[in-house]
């Protein structure tokens, strides 16, 4: 069966985004050109320009591509809301892909690139805020269930959890001996104890 033009377009965009993620992971957010993305994806060097027009637009689309699944996966739908849900999901994610996957390395390369690119910084700030909101929602659900104290500052706790997760991954890039799964488990045990009613 012949694919529709829309199906071909979606496949092309998906391959271009995968190529961009790989290049960002290998070279950083500013270390590649649109033409290299086309070449890496097996297309003409001009195709990324046709799809995304500018490198900034491509980076914005890459962030959306990388983060779409990660926002949904902040908590585990099969675990109780709150800390245990995050422990289950984050622990599985770290055990499965660690911080060495192209996707994870690209995400952190984008954070580092945002230090030097104000437009990318705005995009990454929006992603961080969406992540904090997702964590805060999970904590609110845990409060409603009676698993977490109701007098906590949910936004502050959500920020702290995100900072720990992001910071520990950054440190792991420079010291691969770190066992992030165990460190995360220990930290979340302390947080759960501190927040319990």
Set out the residue ranges of the language-model regions.
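Short amphipathic alpha-helical elements of helix-turn-helix/winged-helix folds
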Residues: 19-23, 134, 164
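Short, basic, alpha-helical segments at the C-terminal edge of helix-turn-helix-like DNA-binding modules
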Residues: 64-70
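Hydrophobic/aromatic-rich alpha-helical bundle segments in the mid-to-C-terminal region
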Residues: 5, 121-125, 129, 143-191, ...
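Hydrophobic alpha-helical connector segments
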Residues: 61, 72-104, 154-161, 184
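Helix-turn-helix
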Residues: 15, 19-57, 61
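Amphipathic alpha-helical segments used for helix-helix packing
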Residues: 85, 98-122
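N-terminal intrinsically disordered/low-complexity leader segments
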Residues: 1-11
């Amino acid at each position: 069966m012949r694919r529709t033009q829309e199906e071909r377009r979606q496949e092309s965009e998906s391959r271009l985004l995968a190529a961009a993620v790989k290049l960002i992971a290998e070279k950083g957010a500013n270390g590649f050109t649109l033409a290299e993305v086309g070449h890496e994806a097996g297309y003409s060097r001009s195709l990324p320009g046709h799809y995304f027009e500018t490198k900034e637009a491509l980076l914005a689309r890459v962030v959306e591509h990388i983060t779409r699944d990660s926002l949904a996966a902040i908590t585990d739908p099969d675990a109780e809301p709150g800390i245990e849900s995050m422990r289950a999901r984050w622990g599985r994610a770290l055990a499965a892909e660690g911080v060495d996957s192209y996707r994870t390395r690209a995400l952190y390369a984008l954070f580092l690139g945002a230090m030097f690119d104000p437009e990318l910084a705005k995009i990454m700030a929006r992603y961080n805020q969406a992540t904090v909101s997702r964590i805060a929602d999970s904590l609110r659900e845990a409060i409603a269930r009676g698993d977490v104290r109701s007098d906590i500052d949910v936004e502050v706790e959500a920020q702290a959890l995100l900072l720990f997760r992001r910071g520990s991954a950054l440190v792991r890039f420079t010291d691969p001996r770190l066992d992030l799964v165990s460190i995360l488990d220990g930290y979340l045990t302390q947080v759960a104890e501190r927040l319990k009613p």
